[in-house]
Amino acid sequence: MAAVDSRGEVLDVQALPLPYFLLRARVAAMEPAQPGQFVMVAGADRSEPYLRRAFSVYDQEPASDGSLVISLLGKVIGRGTEALAACVPGERIPVLGPLGTGFHSVADDASKSGRAALVAGGIGSAGLGLLAQALERARRSFDFFYGGRSAEDLVEAETFRRLSERTGGRLVRTTEDGSAGERGLITTPLEEGLRAGAGYTTVFTCGPHGLMAAVARIAAAGGVAGEAATETPMGCGYGACLGCAVTLKNGGYALCCRQGPVFRLDEVAW
């Protein structure tokens, strides 16, 4: 699947609990993304910041005119994300994608059995949106573990509740301040579920590095395979800048934008 550099028309920007936002754009030439793939985007004013920002394709829908409507779930952190959150309908923004390698276990027919656990930390839920939809279409049951510092960090929680419940699964929430779900870290109910024989055959995760490292440890202890959609600073999105290296257990490196962003849990040196 070849990436295409084009201009996307902003359809709307939905304000979520600060500092989160959901941007929808119509892209004429882009092919549908696979779960876990991403795009490089920037605001309508390209004068500053110069570099684009990497965003997971959170949702997508083919339009009747042959274009693709993509949804990007974001968090305002700096000037780049601030510019995207400030976009207005009708503005045209640069979009390069789809990029990277998605979740392997979704494409592998041999892995489409058994229950799955999806584990997200905060805005990491954006990297699991298409995956949750793919699992639902495959009629594969999954539980969605969603953790954050506070209730405001569990954006789109109801979307993941609906998707998981349609498969016979459930949404599990934790927050560090106890404002939503149980107080604590989301890795605690995941570990308890594995010990209690929840029957997970695959674990998928996206979020802060510490969360994914903990999920990798828990999955290994439970003898369960898994994959992580990693996040690193990224300058170009296609391997030219070499700025998004991920350290592997074999002592080598892989580029998050090319070989990733999805890696097996057991191949990354967390």
Please identify what each model-predicted range represents.
Residues M1-E91:
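Ferredoxin-reductase
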Residues G127, H209-G210, T232-V262:
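Local cysteine-cluster metal-coordination motifs and their immediate loop/turn environment
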Residues R79-A228, P233:
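FNR/FR-type flavoprotein reductase catalytic core
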Residues A44-R46, P98, K249:
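Short, surface-exposed secondary-structure boundary micro-motifs
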Residues D12, D59, R173-T175, A228, ...:
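Structural signal for conserved beta-strand scaffold positions within catalytic alpha/beta enzyme cores
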Residues R264-W270:
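A charged, well-structured terminal subsegment
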